[in-house]
Swiss-Prot record:
Region: Linker, residue numbers: 316-452
Sequence ranges assigned to domain USP in this UniProt record: 453-822
Annotated Gene Ontology cellular component terms: P-body; PAN complex
Gene of this entry: pan2
Biased composition (Low complexity): 1107-1124
Identification of the protein by name: PAN2-PAN3 deadenylation complex catalytic subunit pan2
Co-factor: note: Binds 2 metal cations per subunit in the catalytic exonuclease domain.
GO biological process: mRNA processing; nuclear-transcribed mRNA poly(A) tail shortening
Domain remarks: Contains a pseudo-UCH domain. This ubiquitin C-terminal hydrolase (UCH)-like or ubiquitin specific protease (USP)-like domain is predicted to be catalytically inactive because it lacks the active site catalytic triad characteristic of thiol proteases, with residues at the equivalent structural positions that are incompatible with catalysis, and it cannot bind ubiquitin. It functions as a structural scaffold for intra- and intermolecular interactions in the complex.
RNA-binding in keyword set: no
Entry annotated with the keyword Hydrolase: yes
Organism: Aspergillus oryzae (strain ATCC 42149 / RIB 40) (Yellow koji mold)
Chief place of localization: cytoplasm
Annotated segments matching region Disordered: 1095-1155
EC number, UniProt record: 3.1.13.4
Length: 1155
């Protein structure tokens, strides 16, 4: 027994019935095949427990209750053998019965043991016969008469059998004759064990004509010489004994009171004592490995002893077979509207109960009305339940129709898809009708109520997807302003409102863009991502945007996950509390990111940090220490509220609460280094400098504080602060205006930029966040009036100031406030465009040192991009998530969430100059997320291409690839490509139309509702095949090849324009293309379709991406001179607007802007 042996677990012996009391264990034994401990009880049931935790495994009724307790358990490779007074039973370890043997002469069986043949056991008892049983066949082989009543047996060199008179007989293993007999104990043998050449017994003797007592000696016998050895003294009374399976001369001896002694038989003085916590011990057993000891006590408990560091029942155990986990039945959406055919019913011949006539259907059992959340703070416990004052929101005896509320439609109905509007417009024109395709928010009804319901714009907004994807959704229905909204259906998009607030704070916006323009290439830089997002929102000019890259970076921070700030951690959490924590995290992280590039600069701290010091004074010893107490966010601290004085007490004014929150004097318990213990300490904050941007968390964790915010005009648009000798003076309203007129020294005026609020409309809508922002502060031109806007994800609309700053509604809770110094109004600094760090464009950057294509050459200083420089672009993507599709009962499908793609490769080529068509960027992007599909057929990306350990390509982080494109964008480059709108959306970058040339729309016929593929155009114009299946001589899909082909098509289109044959070319393209299914024919020597001078064209369906090949088609040949090429001209936008879905209704080119 090692020094750390102790009790590992304790369990109760299972009762005989579900409602019965626990019973004592009459037999315990460790399995020598599996990690199981077997227990037999008084009712003939044997139960097994698995592992050191004694997890219940099997339980079997092996013997009838009338036969009494289970008396012994033996183990064989094939199963477990148990013995009762009148039967022998064998089961598998999983509980299946193998055989059950009874005999008329089996009257009082007590013991059993294996014989010399391992497939046979001998059973005996206090009866006149012994029986030999064949384990394999399950029947009695021999019946042996005996004159002894045997109570227990142990097999070693001999079969040692104890009698009921205290003697021990050594029987021959072959014929079971008595070889030697010892009078071991005066009355009876209580326990014994034999191993190798040693036998140890414990028993009872009578002293002085009294009752039998436990002998204080454990007798030892040498089975090799059949002679006794010196006994083991055990003064507590040797009641139970087990020999150690590995240490041949070591034995465990135990008393009935729980004392355990480990003794060496050859050296009785070397002992190890333990005391088990039992009242009365009934038996012990030692595992075959010697690492575990089981104790059975009189309180119906089994104790497992061993070393916590290692405990195994066997040296080499077989794996325990557990029952298969039953498969859960598929979930069924059972409702009154579910047809029986969806569930599956048996055949029937009578009328079903579901055919109940409709005029006999009555509504009963309506759901109870939900509890008004505004009453929760006022609930008081009663004898039964709780009570609260009546809010008097309904009339007397008026009852809420909860069933109608449960079946109500969403408050804000999604608009029609653009494709549907285009079809309706076409139909309306044919019928002579006029329809309004630009529906406004005022035209939508809320549950059939008034059309001008003010709650509409606060409702949850959700993107709907048609088979054409997100481009078919009418975002202009929700936003007719010049300010862009942010899309949902992105992980952590609940932060959209806070990101919009940051964007409209000029000083934060300037810092983010200046940092993005610097040399920062840190992968998880939140400040860079904010700069990219703010630039995208400004370039979008009212079009919808998405913060995919920023939110992915936010989700990658372990700190954010551990603090529970991610969307996956928001279950049962208040959005108000969460967004305030996110606000604190964002500001702390961007401060850290700023110092990564400019570690010695305090520019950001000057803008965001409240510079202060904290003095901590022990209230016991009066010792005081001072430490820095800078903070990026100030949390409002409210005083005790007296409802009667709430409007008259000046302490309840916002300015006074703000001052107390910044100075912050508190008392709590803390560690005192002088007292060397926890004491009551006073903490006082001394402010030295206030920031230019003051971020405040409202901390409305008590409903009583909402009374202050409900006061009209309580939140001021402007506050004035004065820092004087570590003290703060705060003014608002008339006091502020008076001091501004008097030019008070040191007065700094802050104006409110915006508020992030939680909206929780209790009409089956989930809580969400919106922001109210004064957009005039960030305008580049001075404005005389303040214009407030509501940003509800991608719903953006103008609201008046009173509505934005009114918080008397119970469903509108302010969370985050942002104030900025008034002197920084309109301080929109765009100088970052002149100081772009373009080093990344002129040098190679690689994670793995992977090789680039042989033709790639980075830009030289002589090739520095300038405004109007054309570059050809093509990107490839892989699937990170498959689309989530809802299949309805009628078989129709609705896209709930589209597939999620990840940028995998970016190729950029020179579009002009002597090295035209030569790539200078060809980056593969490493992806840490799980890739569900490489879509190799369309992307050319194969497994292993994006793994730094195996990739042979130039791998870079997404941040590096994105920044290269962002630099080209802001240097004024014009991007030439095919299907660029989809690429830009997946990259998450906003490119103005004046910097885009999309060949998908160049070769577009205004009267044909079809867009042609790059693959088809390449064959038709240049007689070349691209995007083919990979072969030995062809690598298959290649983004460099696609970008170069788009560049050549653009040049060719310019030639068509110079020749004045664009319309004729397009007509013939579509006419001949329709014969070929707008697909290139198979390779058979066929030439291009066109027979006109200078042309060779065909086109394709879908979005211009790798349409499968068609059966072989032969086209006519053409041979003609080409039109003269024209020098490069700066191009304008050729990509349609977001809302233009059906190009057949108009001309995107507007008279060919290339001219």
């Amino acid at each position: 027994m090692e020094a750390d042996w102790d009790e590992l677990s304790r369990i109760q012996v299972p009762p005989p019935s579900p409602h019965g009391m626990p019973t004592i264990a009459t037999a315990i034994a460790f399995d020598d095949v599996m990690e199981l401990l077997w227990v037999g009880n008084e009712y003939g049931r044997i139960t097994s427990f698995c592992g050191p935790e004694l997890q219940r495994y099997t339980s079997v009724r092996a013997h009838p209750v009338s036969e009494g307790p289970v008396r012994q358990i033996l183990f064989h490779d094939r199963g477990v053998i148990s013995l009762s007074s009148k039967s022998v039973h064998m089961i598998t370890r999983r509980g299946l019965t193998q055989w059950h043997i009874t005999h008329e002469d089996m009257t009082d069986l007590r013991c059993m043991s294996f014989t010399a043949q391992l497939n046979k056991v001998i059973v005996a008892g206090c009866q006149k016969a012994m029986f030999t049983i064949d384990i394999d066949k399950g029947h009695i082989v021999d019946k042996l008469p005996t004159e002894y009543n045997y109570t227990m047996m142990k097999k070693s060199r001999y079969l040692c059998a104890a009698t009921d008179t205290g003697s021990v007989n050594a029987l021959s293993l072959t014929d079971f004759r008595v070889v030697k007999s010892w009078k071991a104990h005066g009355t009876a043998v209580n326990d014994m064990d034999a191993r190798n050449d040693l036998l140890v017994t414990c028993g009872f003797s009578v002293r002085h004509l009294g009752s039998p007592i436990v002998d204080p000696l454990a007798n030892v016998y040498d089975l090799k010489t059949l002679s006794p050895l010196p006994p083991i003294p055990f003064h507590a009374g040797a009641a139970y004994v087990r020999m150690h399976p590995k240490l041949h001369t070591t034995s465990f001896v135990a008393s009935q009171t729980g004392q355990l002694q480990v003794v060496d038989l050859m050296n009785p003085n070397a002992i190890n004592l333990r005391q088990a916590n039992v009242s009365f011990m009934l038996g012990i057993d030692l595992s075959p490995s010697g690492e575990a000891l089981a104790i059975n006590d009189a309180e119906c408990a089994i104790h497992l002893w061993g070393s916590p560091s290692k405990v195994h029942f066997n040296e080499m155990s077989k794996e325990v077979e557990f029952a298969d986990v039953p498969a859960r039945p598929p979930p069924l959406d059972w409702s009154p509207d579910t047809p029986l055919s969806m569930i599956g019913m048996p055949y029937y011949h009578e009328r079903l109960f579901s055919a109940w006539p409709s005029h006999l259907v009555f509504e009963i059992g309506s759901p109870p009305a939900p509890i008004d959340q505004a009453l929760i703070p006022y609930l008081r416990p009663a004898e039964i339940g709780h009570y609260a004052p009546n809010p008097k929101k309904t009339r007397r005896n008026q009852v809420e129709n909860t069933r109608a509320l449960a079946n109500s439609e969403p408050a804000l109905i999604a608009p029609k898809f653009l494709s549907e509007k285009a079809r309706e417009q076409s139909k309306a024109k044919s019928d002579g009708l006029v329809t309004d395709a630009a529906e406004t928010l005022a035209g939508t009804k809320l549950n059939g109520e008034a059309e001008d319901d003010p709650l509409l714009k606060y409702s949850n907004v959700e993107i709907k997807y048609s088979r054409f994807g997100v481009d078919d959704f009418d975002f202009r229905f929700y936003n007719q302003t010049k300010f862009s909204g942010l899309e949902t259906h992105i992980a952590n998009s609940f932060t959209n409102a806070l990101l919009q607030l940051f964007k409209f704070i000029p000083l934060i916006r300037n810092v983010a863009l200046q940092h993005a323009a610097s040399a920062c290439i840190f992968e998880n830089c939140l400040l860079c991502e904010m700069g990219y997002l703010f630039d995208m929102l400004e370039k979008a000019d009212g079009q919808n945007c998405q913060a995919t890259n920023l939110l992915k970076t936010f989700g990658s921070f372990r700190e954010a996950s551990s603090l529970g700030l991610l969307e996956e951690n928001l279950t049962n959490k208040s959005l108000s509390t969460s967004i305030q924590s996110v606000n604190r995290f964002f500001l702390g992280q961007i401060s850290h990111d700023f110092r990564m590039i400019l570690p010695s600069s305090d520019d950001l701290d000057h803008k965001l940090a409240t510079v202060a010091s904290e003095s901590i004074r022990c209230m016991f010893c009066q010792k005081e220490i001072v430490r820095p107490g800078n903070s990026l966010v100030n949390e409002l601290i409210y005083p005790a509220i007296d409802i009667k004085q709430i409007r008259r007490n000046p302490a309840y004014r916002f300015s006074n609460i703000l001052r107390a929150s910044i100075e912050r004097e508190t008392q709590n318990r803390g560690w005192c280094n002088y007292c060397r213990r926890y004491q009551q300490v006073a903490i006082r904050k001394t402010v030295h400098r206030m920031p230019l941007v003051m971020m405040l968390n409202t901390a409305l964790n008590n409903p009583i504080y909402r009374r202050l915010w409900a006061i009209p005009g309580w939140l001021p648009e402007a506050v004035g602060l004065v820092v004087d000798a570590g003290q703060i003076l705060c003014f608002e309203g008339e006091d502020l205006r008076m001091r501004m007129q008097n030019n008070m020294p040191g007065l700094v005026v802050y104006e409110l930029v915006g508020v992030v609020s939680e909206i929780d409309i209790p009409e089956h809508q989930k809580a969400h966040l919106v922001s109210f922002i004064n957009v005039s502060i960030s305008s580049r031109e001075p404005e005389t009036t303040n214009k407030w806007h509501l940003f509800n994800d991608f719903l953006v609309t103008e609201v008046d100031k009173d509505e934005a700053l009114r918080f008397n509604q119970p469903w509108k809770v302010p969370c985050v406030l942002a104030y900025q110094v008034k002197d920084a109004r309109h301080a929109m600094d765009d100088n970052w465009k002149n100081v772009l760090d373009t080093t990344l464009l002129y040098r190679d950057w690689s994670l793995n040192g992977g090789r680039s294509v042989e033709s790639l050459a980075t830009l030289s200083e002589e090739e520095k991009p300038t405004p109007g420089t054309p570059v050809a672009l093509d990107t490839e993507f892989v699937d990170l998530e498959k689309a989530e599709i809802d299949v309805k009962a009628d078989g129709s499908q609705e896209i709930v969430r589209p597939s999620k793609s990840g940028l995998a490769r970016v190729s950029v080529l020179r579009g002009s100059g002597t090295r035209e068509g030569v790539p200078f960027i060809d980056d593969y992007i490493t992806i840490k997320e799980t890739i569900v599909d490489y879509v190799t057929q369309y992307s050319g990306i194969k497994p292993g291409d994006l793994d730094p350990r195996t990739s042979q390509h130039n791998l870079v982080p997404l941040k590096v690839a994105y920044k290269k494109l962002w630099l080209l964008l802001n240097l004024g480059c014009v991007f030439v490509g095919h299907g660029l709108a989809s690429d830009f959306r997946k990259i998450n970058i906003q490119v103005p139309k004046c910097q885009t040339v999309d060949t998908q729309y160049l070769f577009f016929h205004p009267g044909k509702n079809r867009r042609l593929s790059l693959r088809y155009l390449a064959w038709a114009v240049f007689k070349e095949y691209i995007q083919e299946e990979p072969t030995d001589n062809n690598q298959g899909h290649d983004s460099i090849e696609d970008a170069r082909m788009a560049l050549r098509l653009w040049k060719k289109f310019q030639e068509y324009e110079d020749a004045g044959v664009v319309s004729q070319i397009l007509e013939e393209l579509f006419r001949e293309g329709s014969k070929l299914g707008f697909r290139p024919p198979a390779r058979n020597g066929a030439t291009a379709v066109l027979s006109r001078p200078g042309t060779a064209v065909t086109m394709q369906n879908n979005s211009g991406r790798n349409t499968p090949s068609t059966p072989e088609v032969t086209a006519p040949t053409a041979s003609a001179p080409t039109t003269p090429r024209q020098g490069f001209r700066r191009s304008v936008a050729l990509t349609p607007s977001n809302g233009s879905f059906a190009p057949g209704t108009g001309d995107f080119f507007g008279g060919s802007p290339l001219k």
